[in-house]
A protein has these predicted regions:
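Structural recognition of the beta-strand scaffold that forms the well-ordered cores
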Residues: 2-3, 75, 175, 220-222
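Aromatic-lined glycan-binding groove of carbohydrate-active enzymes
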Residues: 106, 110-120, 161-212
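Active-site gating/metal-coordination segments in enzymes
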Residues: 1-156
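Mid-to-C-terminal alpha-helical segments outside catalytic/metal-binding sites
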Residues: 32-39, 61-64, 163-164, 172-173, ...
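Short, well-ordered coil/turn segments that N-cap beta-strands
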Residues: 40-46, 69-74, 102-104, 170-173, ...
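Histidine/acidic-residue-rich catalytic or RNA/ligand-binding cores of hydrolases
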Residues: 13, 114-127, 180-196, 232-236, ...
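Active-site neighborhood of phospho(di)ester-bond hydrolases with catalytic His/Asp-centered motifs
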Residues: 47-48, 77, 109, 177, ...
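Aromatic-anchored helix/helix-loop segment that forms the rim or "lid"
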Residues: 138-156, 199-230
Length: 287
């Protein structure tokens, strides 16, 4: 199972843009600490944070060390810093190529956006009613934050498709973690519609398949306890959906399996096998 460095990650990210040397040193310490923690149990797959926003050269150095340390899962940002090129720019091809060559899984996670985490503008919450603050947690603290938490991931993944990165690196795998899952069904439809609408207005020649086919081939997603698992599995998510508990965080509830199973009374055993086991194995490219 995948282990994330949530509290320590927030401390490191606080130095981003303040002191590059301290920030990159903190990234290395973060990765080393999680490597050491997970080394006692081979079933724990720690995530090495690769700071794409620090630039290609710095990110490649961290990536090479993570590969040497034996990491199999990489955590990345979704949105590049201001005045910097997209992570889909050809400058970043060496990073995607190295990840594909090493057969590593990439994961996106709530809060790891490349900028201060704020799923909705503060102004939308200034409505005259009491509300939970956005800050101090990467978990969605209110209904509006829940609605907006996956937007950055959608944009990043759409760029990976429309800019041809998934076409160029066809075995690259990306998991979307703790950002919900129900949205991905309509998102695939919107991807295909966007491609049809703009393929004659802009150069989308690097998109050789339906955009949703890249999703099916290269993306996995985890639901929150309480989402309708059977509906997602039977409406296009059969090969996308992976079980996650979010242990020990409260978002997973004290019985995530029970919550999931309440929505799976009509789910076939082959689909359950994909949800609980096979799709995760596909993400980490395990036999």
């Amino acid at each position: 199972y995948i282990v994330f460095p949530t509290p320590a990650f927030d401390q490191i990210i606080a130095m981003r843009g303040v002191d590059d040397e301290v920030y990159l040193g903190g990234v290395e310490a973060l990765n080393q600490g999680l490597h050491d923690f997970c080394s006692v149990d081979k079933s724990m797959l720690g995530t090495a944070y690769i700071p794409l926003g620090a630039g290609v050269d710095s990110a490649l150095k961290v990536l090479e060390r993570a590969i040497h340390q034996g990491f199999r899962v990489l955590l990345i940002d979704t949105i590049p810093p201001k005045n910097q090129v997209s992570f889909t720019h050809p400058d970043y091809y060496p990073i995607w190529a190295r990840i594909q060559e090493a057969q590593l899984a990439v994961v996106l996670h709530i809060g790891a956006t490349g900028a201060p985490y704020k799923p909705v503008p503060d102004e939308l919450l200034d409505n005259g009613n009491p509300h939970s603050p956005q800050a101090h947690s990467d978990a969605p603290p209110n209904a509006m934050s829940y609605m907006g938490m996956h937007y950055n991931a959608e944009l990043f993944l759409a760029a990976m498709i429309f800019d041809g990165v998934f076409e160029r690196f066809p075995t690259l795998k990306i998991g979307v973690v703790e950002l919900g899952a129900s949205w991905i069904i309509s998102w695939m439809q919107r991807l295909d519609q966007a491609h049809r609408a703009f393929r004659k207005l802009q150069d989308l020649s690097q998109v050789k398949m339906k955009p949703s086919d890249y999703v099916q081939r290269q993306i996995k997603v985890t639901p929150f306890a309480g989402e309708d698992i059977d509906w997602i599995l039977t409406h296009g998510g059969e090969d996308l959906l992976m079980f996650a508990s979010d242990y020990p965080h409260h978002e997973g509830t004290d019985d995530p399996i029970g919550r999931f199973e309440k929505t799976m009374s009509n789910t076939s055993e082959p689909l359950k096998q994909k949800f609980y086991t096979d799709n995760f194995k596909s993400l980490i490219q395990a036999s």
